[in-house]
Amino acid sequence: MTKITEVAAAVIERPGEFLLAQRPAGKPYPGYWEFPGGKIEPGEDPRSALVRELREELGIEVRAATPWITRVYAYTHATVRLHFWRVTAWDGEPQPLEDQDIRWQSVAAPDVAPMLPANAPVLAALALPAVMIVSDATAMGIDRWIERLTALVVQEQVLVQVREKAMEHLRVQHLVSRALTRAEPFGSRVVVNSDSGSFPQATGIHLTSRALMEATARPAALLVGASCHDADQLAQAVRLGLDYAVLGAVKPTASHPGATPLGWERFADLARDLPMPVYAIGGLTRADLAEAREHGAHGVALLSAAFG
């Protein structure tokens, strides 16, 4: 059995930026850029290791950190399991205490190279917005929904999921085209729910849980996610190499009044140690974002509270 080295890795964030460190001479992959962190010692949990490593490596004291994603990568010299945490508050100013270079990078356009192979895919995950909005144009009306979307994307970058199961194909096509025109100039991306049809002009596709379980390979799209409700569906999303999952319902919802919600503890159990970002959905608002992240979510997906 291959020995796996457990590593705590920090995504240290300030508005629009994150911190990378360059590996010094004398270590494997010298000159490569990576997220700060280091090995988890026997008896340590990932958060404790993270706090210790950032104190030793950068001279900062972590005040706020939340679990994010976990990725396994096999290098020629070692196989590592990287436990990524998002660090959003700390005391002190990061300093290179181990002869390494450090640089703040734009989330939208990081410009250092080369990146450690294990860390490069993390940049795509980090670029996903914290909020997904799910369309409700059938009930609201296309013009009104587009008007609300237009006002939103000027202020906030979001991931837009067009999900209109009761709308005819040509009207969905019209909605997708207008959503793309409004959203893309401001950096927001648009995916279309697989129940609404195929629209190659969109950024990507969002699989229903049924379509997810029927899939034998990742769909050919730039961005692919899926709705999940249990561990089996999440495992299938991992097997297909999807870019994100949406997991819920976390709280009671008006659309599914008889369903038993997951609750935050069950959500955390299901989302733990997954390699892709997970959005929490179900009865949530933007006010739930902090709690969602405490339980391992990348962000929240909103329907009724999308514009509230």
Where are these regions (language model features)?
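Conserved, mostly hydrophobic/aromatic
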Residues: 133, 160, 237, 245, ...
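The catalytic Nudix box helix
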Residues: 35-67
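Active-site mouth loops of central-metabolism enzymes
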Residues: 129-145, 223-228
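Active-site-adjacent beta-strand/loop module that shapes the phosphate/pyrophosphate-binding cleft
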Residues: 71-94
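Glycine-rich phosphate-binding active-site loops on the catalytic face of alpha/beta enzymes
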Residues: 209-217, 246-258, 283-308
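Alpha-helix-loop-beta-strand connector modules within alpha/beta enzyme cores
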Residues: 173-191, 209, 216-230, 258-285
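NUDIX/MutT-family hydrolases
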Residues: 84-86, 94-127
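Conserved N-terminal beta-strand and adjoining loop/helix that marks the start
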Residues: 1-19, 70
